[in-house]
Amino acid sequence: MSEYLFTSESVSEGHPDKVADQVSDAILDAILAQDPKARVAAETLVNTGLCVLAGEITTTAQVDYIKVARETIKRIGYNSSELGFDANGCAVGVYYDQQSPDIAQGVNEGEGIDLNQGAGDQGLMFGYACDETPTLMPFAIYYSHRLMQRQSELRKDGRLPWLRPDAKAQLTVVYDSETGKVKRIDTVVLSTQHDPAISHEELSKAVIEQIIKPVLPPELLTDETKYLINPTGRFVIGGPQGDCGLTGRKIIVDTYGGAAPHGGGAFSGKDPSKVDRSAAYACRYVAKNIVAAGLATQCQIQVSYAIGVAEPTSISIDTFGTGKISEEKLIALVCEHFDLRPKGIVQMLDLLRPIYGKSAAYGHFGREEPEFTWERTDKAASLKAAAGL
């Protein structure tokens, strides 16, 4: 019986790129709480002792950006120079401009050539769902995120007090080539920042027994499963001191772990007029409802947009041979049941709210948080009925 391997990774909230994402989304939320129609493109850079805030923001909101940045960094756990980054002591620079009026006229209703709210940029976005996990996400990315959430939980509640904020996990999974189903877990890689006093042996044992085994399905862990824990032997220097962090540099971690294509546009720090974010959320919503309806066990959708134009320039669907109806019929159903114009997406998913901070670590998809409207399967029944199944 032939097999193949597939790997995905996740990173913790203390990873420098994720620190940047969380600061950007915290600033977005602070603005949307006061001004839901704000235009925000908030970029963040974090390095040793430094946090730089830049981008384009047009808003009536009055926000203390420096305070928001410091509070976010502190909540993550960087509150001492001993950890490599200190929320209270780092320098924070603010360099925001306003959105270009040339872009604004294409996005604001009634101002551009297309009188509807146009897309904020050209681009292509993907959505994906499959039946490998309860939340209809690919196995490797779903469980990589859960490992990182477990690391954070044990760090914050004090059960493993030598843990520090920066960490990464990577899962390699064995699939059956004939059925496409997960057979077993081949390799677990987990690297975590730690207090210098802990030995590698003690750390490895605790990570395997208290982080990995409580999270991963025990029936998929075998005698052949390999565990690579802090493989360099030491991970004391981490976070923004170990590496410079930038918003938007973990786009595969944020989405499907490489199991589906990515259009290239990052999410964090962007208000919902940016289709990079809102249309990617809508695509996940569409794909998840198609799988939840039983119309396919695997579904990938691509949409594309032109700046200033409301209607998508293309919609395509691939069910990888698992569809119960043709892909042409699925596209027709999608057009009938989902409004994929930018304003329609915002209304359909109720996106003009301060809901984004939670999405900036541990994945934007496959988490049944009440704010994550794109994870609902409320269209599944109507799709199934319309398909005649």
Swiss-Prot record:
The keyword Metal-binding applies. Its cofactor is Mg(2+); K(+). One of its GO terms (cellular component) is cytoplasm. This is S-adenosylmethionine synthase. It comes from Neisseria gonorrhoeae (strain NCCP11945). The keyword Kinase does not apply. Catalyzes the formation of S-adenosylmethionine (AdoMet) from methionine and ATP. The overall synthetic reaction is composed of two sequential steps, AdoMet formation and the subsequent tripolyphosphate hydrolysis which occurs prior to release of AdoMet from the enzyme. K(+) binds at residue 43. Homotetramer; dimer of dimers. CDD domains: S-AdoMet_synt.
